């Protein structure tokens, strides 16, 4: 052994069954010790001989090993026609173009973005058309747009509806619900002269306030309504069954009650009010005028506790006289709603007890009562279903969170001898949402998602300690071992919970805060859990407004000390889409792009005693795969979440 080493070249033939036969020049080098072998080589000791051989996917002497580009060698890879070969260190990947999915035995097949939830970006009203490698969106008849954004056009809506602006889009809606308010007191026909001109008006409006709640139906004298030439409705107001009607608004000037005119539309709404589709006045100074007598209301709004009675020639709703209420605790209506608690008292029943005026407030007097009309004339007060606001107190046990407060009732601002207290409480069974709200500092991430034609929704993701998802981690950090399980919950907060299900499309971990980091460990991919990790359990996904999964704690192999969690979510329309994933067999990457605007982020997860963990791992394992795997050794992890 006078030389450093001796080189022996051996020609070998490697047969890959059913695929290719390739020849490779594998070099074996005799060495003095295994320390001389390259990091991408194996060392074999056979008696007195120590040899170094490059790993599969590498070529060289054993002292030096370089990556073998399988993509550049004909027959060295098994990527099918239509797919692309991408060389990696020691191996290669077969990838498909966007819009295709790699399937064993079939190669790259087209992905039907229209049938799989979360893949298309079509507007809620648009029709999705699948094409080879892509898809297209087409707005419905009467709508305009590129399919991802659809807007109605005038005259395209059904009876009683109109094309109105909602947010930054035009949609078919009921103008009784979608309108703007004109509440100027000077619009009253009893107000004097002025120089107001209604320029810039365009769309549906409702008149409110002390000036009147509907347009005047008779010719208004000039120099009234704070303008020179008052505008009035030349015709009668419609009834509710007539829907939207066309009318003419006239302007009075120089002895002509209709010297100028403008075409408008009117609709009668439930509740006894009207909405008007107005245009700006044809000249200045002209303004729309309201009838001041209409502010007194009509008997169309009377509740079951009221009669329509005349007083000084004016008809109005007045409380019936047959009330005989002695127990105030029978008056309250308590509503335990998801986000708040509402207590309502009947004004007519309070009046029968002698309360001509009602001053109502909670423990925190800033939370005071307000009037509202529904099936009755109510005075109500609302407190958030949280500990603290309005003086609300929360008590929690193993199964429920109970919120309590006290309602104070007086008939004068200055209380002398009549002060009534009503204690009330609401109990909520503990679930993910209630548990988060009852925790002091839950570890949670949230994001707002916009749904076309529906509005903004808030989705939250939180970390829980137990499999019943009722005990969230609190504070800024938490300590776990890799033997422990982490329970992750996502939930839709508010919005139309009856229409949408929350679908977790991709949930994964990265070693950096960058959610687009190419090194990802998928927990859920393409809506289905990773089948090669037996610690992953998806409890709920695409079935309700919440999602839940659990996974055993892990770290990334290599020089990574941090782990971040990310979850891409999608609001699935349960009426028009199939939301619950169907998961069976081996799952393959679809090559779809993750929409970062729909990703929730939590992290980082920081390991303690890094050096000790690394040394133990090196002594107990001959090889460490360069992929993200759960740790086999027990180690302490500290989670510090932004």
From Swiss-Prot:
A lipid is attached at residue 620 (GPI-anchor amidated serine). Residues 599-607 are annotated as: External hydrophobic patch (EHP). Residues 621-642 form a propeptide. It is a lipid-anchor; GPI-anchor. Residues 587-590 are annotated as: Essential for cleavage by HPN. It comes from the Eukaryota. Residues 32-64, 67-109, 110-151, 294-325 form the EGF-like domain. One of its GO terms (cellular component) is basolateral plasma membrane. Residues 455-465 are annotated as: Internal hydrophobic patch (IHP). The record marks 588-589 as: Cleavage. Residues 1-26 form the signal peptide. Disulfide bonds join 34-43, 37-52, 54-65, 71-85, 79-94, 96-108, 114-128, 122-137, 139-150, 152-163, 157-172, 176-269, 197-284, 219-257, 225-289, 250-258, 299-308, 302-317, 319-348, 336-426, 367-390, 507-567, 528-583, 572-579. Detected in kidney and pancreas. GO terms for biological process: antibacterial innate immune response; defense response to Gram-negative bacterium; neutrophil migration. Residues 335-430 are annotated as: ZP-N. GO terms for molecular function: calcium ion binding. Glycans are attached at residues 40, 78, 134, 234, 246, 277, 324, 397, 448, 514. Residues 431-454 are annotated as: Flexible ZP-N/ZP-C linker. InterPro entries: EGF-like_Ca-bd_dom, EGF-like_dom, EGF-type_Asp/Asn_hydroxyl_site, EGF_Ca-bd_CS, EGF_dom, Growth_fac_rcpt_cys_sf, NOTCH1_EGF-like, ZP-C. The ZP domain mediates polymerization, leading to the formation of long filaments. The core of the filament consists of interlocked ZP domains which assemble into a helical structure. Each ZP domain consists of an N-terminal (ZP-N) and C-terminal (ZP-C) region connected by a flexible linker; the linker allows the ZP domain to wrap around the ZP-C subdomain of the preceding subunit. The heavily glycosylated N-terminal part of the protein (containing several EGF-like domains) forms branches which protrude from the core and are involved in pathogen capture. This is Uromodulin. The lineage of its organism: Eukaryota, Metazoa, Chordata, Craniata, Vertebrata.
């Amino acid at each position: 052994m006078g030389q450093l080493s001796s080189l022996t070249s051996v020609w070998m033939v490697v047969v890959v069954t059913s695929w290719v036969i390739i020849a490779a020049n594998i070099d074996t080098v005799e060495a003095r010790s295994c320390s001389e072998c390259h990091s991408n080589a194996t060392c074999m000791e056979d008696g007195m001989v120590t040899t170094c051989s490059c790993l599969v996917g590498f070529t060289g002497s054993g002292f030096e090993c370089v990556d073998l580009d399988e993509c550049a060698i004909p027959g060295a890879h098994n990527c099918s026609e239509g797919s692309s070969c991408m060389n990696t260190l020691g191996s290669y990947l077969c990838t498909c173009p966007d819009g295709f999915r790699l399937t064993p035995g079939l190669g790259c097949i087209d992905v039907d973005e229209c049938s799989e939830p979360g893949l298309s970006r079509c507007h809620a009203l648009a029709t999705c058309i699948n094409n080879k490698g892509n898809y297209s969106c087409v707005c419905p008849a009467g709508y305009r747009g590129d399919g991802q954004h659809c807007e109605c056009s005038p005259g395209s809506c059904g009876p009683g509806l109109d094309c109105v602006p909602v947010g930054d889009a035009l949609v078919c809606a009921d103008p009784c619900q979608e309108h703007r308010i004109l509440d100027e007191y000077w619009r009253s026909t009893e107000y004097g002269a002025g120089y107001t001109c209604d320029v810039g008006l365009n769309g549906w409006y409702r008149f409110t306030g002390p000036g009147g709640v509907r347009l005047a139906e008779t010719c208004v004298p000039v120099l009234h309504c704070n303008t020179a030439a008052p505008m009035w409705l030349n015709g009668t107001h419609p009834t509710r069954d007539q829907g939207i009607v066309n009318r003419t608004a006239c302007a009075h000037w120089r002895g002509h009650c209709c010297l100028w005119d403008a075409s408008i539309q009117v609709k009668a709404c439930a509740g006894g009010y009207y909405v008007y589709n107005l245009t700006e006045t044809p000249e200045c100074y002209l303004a729309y005028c309201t009838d001041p007598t209409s502010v007194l209301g009509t008997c169309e709004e009377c509740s079951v506790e009221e009669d329509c009675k005349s007083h000084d020639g004016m008809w109005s709703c007045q409380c019936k006289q047959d009330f005989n209420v002695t127990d105030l605790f029978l008056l309250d209506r308590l509503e335990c709603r998801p986000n708040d608690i509402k207590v309502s008292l009947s004004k007519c029943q309070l009046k029968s007890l002698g309360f001509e005026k009602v001053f109502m407030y909670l423990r925190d007097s800033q939370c005071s009562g307000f009037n509202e009309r529904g099936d009755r004339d109510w005075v109500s007060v609302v407190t958030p279903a949280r500990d603290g606001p309005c003086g609300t107190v929360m008590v929690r046990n193993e199964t429920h969170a109970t919120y309590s407060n006290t309602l104070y009732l007086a008939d004068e601002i200055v209380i002398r001898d009549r002060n009534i207290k009503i204690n009330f409480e609401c109990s909520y069974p503990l679930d993910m949402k209630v548990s988060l709200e009852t925790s002091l500092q839950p570890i949670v991430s949230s994001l707002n998602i916009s749904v076309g034609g529906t509005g903004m929704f808030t989705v939250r993701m939180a970390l829980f300690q137990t499999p019943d998802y009722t005990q969230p981690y609190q504070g800024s950090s938490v300590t776990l071992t890799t033997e422990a399980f982490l329970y992750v919950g996502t939930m839709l907060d508010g919005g139309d919970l009856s229409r949408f299900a929350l679908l977790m499309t991709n949930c994964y971990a990265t070693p950096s805060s960058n959610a687009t980091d190419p090194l990802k460990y998928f927990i859920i991919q393409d809506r289905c859990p990773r089948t090669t990790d037996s610690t992953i359990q998806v409890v709920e996904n695409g079935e309700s407004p919440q999602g839940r999964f659990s996974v055993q704690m892990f770290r990334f192999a290599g020089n990574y000390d941090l782990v971040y969690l990310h979850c891409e979510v999608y609001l699935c329309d349960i009426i028009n889409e199939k939301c619950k994933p169907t998961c069976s067999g081996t799952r393959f990457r679809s090559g779809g792009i993750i929409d970062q605007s729909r990703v929730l982020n939590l992290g980082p997860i920081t390991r303690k005693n890094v050096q000790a963990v690394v040394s133990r791992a090196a002594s107990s394992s001959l090889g460490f795969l360069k992929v993200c795997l759960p740790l086999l050794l027990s180690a302490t992890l500290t989670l510090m979440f932004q």
